[in-house]
Amino acid sequence: MSTSNGSANGTNGVGLPRGDEPEIIAVRRGMFGNRDTGDTSGYGRLVRPVALPGSTPRPYGGYFDAVMDRLAEVLGEERYAMSIERVVVYRDQLTIEVSRVQLPAVASVLRDDPDLRFELCLGVSGVHYPEDTGRELHAVYPLMSITHNRRIQLEVAAPDADPHIPSLYAVYPTTDWHERETYDFFGIIFDGHPSLTRIEMPDDWEGHPQRKDYPLGGIPVEYHGAQIPPPDQRRSYS
């Protein structure tokens, strides 16, 4: 059975190939990534691309091959190709990038199959890459198999223009508040969640404060007798 990496585009569920090369998500200039001309560090002319790791060729190492072999066997060749965008092993962590349409089905297999048994989802982490066109919003799900003492993670991407990802509440009920927090801070809409409302910010809050395009602001703070202005009013070198 073929288990080659990647074929489904996670933004729309259509079978489009993903490249095996690292994915450039930003270009940083200067040592501190500043965007103006006020760099006084002497490193203002540095240019560094920021990239996500590309697909990892087999063998993956350790139990990772056994996990992917079994997942491919249960899904079947056609469904595997529709579901799995690519497989990345980076710093001893297996990440399975999944088409968002197929996320609940893949998670159900990982939870229920006796040879996999990833019974526990440890949470949901949102990430915003504003320069990753068409894949600006990412959701990452760390999974753990208590039965087999294994850890992997799933990753799903969605565009800013259509920030919808299927909820995993029906598969892992413990994601309830985690998905609410990710919605609150990043604006990812988890379709099928039983009560997708803000959990930390006020209900009438505008915007999602952990997105990189969220405006910097704040209130002044008094500390040891000194008045510290909010971040958007502090001294700059521009």
Swiss-Prot record:
Protein family: Belongs to the complex I 30 kDa subunit family.
Membrane disposition: Peripheral membrane protein
Function (record text): NDH-1 shuttles electrons from NADH, via FMN and iron-sulfur (Fe-S) centers, to quinones in the respiratory chain. The immediate electron acceptor for the enzyme in this species is believed to be a menaquinone. Couples the redox reaction to proton translocation (for every two electrons transferred, four hydrogen ions are translocated across the cytoplasmic membrane), and thus conserves the redox energy in a proton gradient.
PANTHER family on file: NADH DEHYDROGENASE [UBIQUINONE] IRON-SULFUR PROTEIN 3, MITOCHONDRIAL, NADH DEHYDROGENASE UBIQUINONE IRON-SULFUR PROTEIN 3
UniProt keyword Membrane, yes or no: yes
Pfam family, one: Complex1_30kDa
GO cellular component annotations of the record: plasma membrane
A molecular-function term among this protein's GO annotations: NADH:ubiquinone reductase (non-electrogenic) activity
Region of interest (Disordered), ranges: 1-20
Protein name: NADH-quinone oxidoreductase subunit C
Keyword Membrane: yes
Alphabetized InterPro entries for the sequence: NADH_DH_suC, NADH_quin_OxRdtase_su_C/D-like, NADH_UbQ_OxRdtase_30kDa_su
Chemical reaction(s) catalysed: a quinone + NADH + 5 H(+)(in) = a quinol + NAD(+) + 4 H(+)(out)
Complex formation: NDH-1 is composed of 14 different subunits. Subunits NuoB, C, D, E, F, and G constitute the peripheral sector of the complex.
EC number: 7.1.1.-
Organism this protein belongs to: Mycolicibacterium smegmatis (strain ATCC 700084 / mc(2)155) (Mycobacterium smegmatis)
Top-level lineage group: Bacteria
Localization annotation: Cell membrane
Bias type Polar residues, positions: 1-11
